[in-house]
Regions:
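Rossmann-like adenosine-cofactor binding region
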Residues: 4-83, 87-97, 101-104
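Non-transmembrane, aqueous-exposed alpha-helical and coiled segments at domain scale
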Residues: 110-112
Length: 112
């Protein structure tokens, strides 16, 4: 069996057993298919879709088939619009911390 088939098989098997699935591949779909589909998700799991790809002119999608997987998963992030805003916040915080470090100021503590 080719290694690609083994990789796909193992990915499906591992995802099906997982309580948490985080997908961040951002790969183009084959024949319009999503990387993560409902049959790969354990009922009640949490699915975080970080992957981001262009699917057409001005159209974007994540790695996860949101419509199908949301019927199986207990929690799921939409994409686009799910994890992106949090990524921007984290990046901006890192820029501020780097600037403070550069001029000799201590890293500011922020309440969680």
């Amino acid at each position: 069996m080719p290694s690609k088939c083994c990789t796909i098989f193992m990915t499906r098997l591992i995802c099906r057993q997982s309580d948490l699935v985080i997908s961040c591949a951002g790969v183009a779909p084959v024949d319009g298919a999503f990387l993560i589909t409902a049959d790969m998700i354990k009922p009640g799991a949490c699915v975080i879709d970080v992957g981001f790809r262009r699917i057409g002119r001005g159209q974007f999608a994540g790695d996860v088939d949101f419509a199908a997987v949301s019927a199986v998963a207990e929690w799921i992030t939409p994409n686009p619009g799910g994890t992106g805003p949090m990524t921007v916040v984290a990046l901006m915080q890192n820029v501020i911390d780097a600037a403070r470090y550069r001029i000799g100021l201590a890293r500011a503590e922020y309440p969680v």
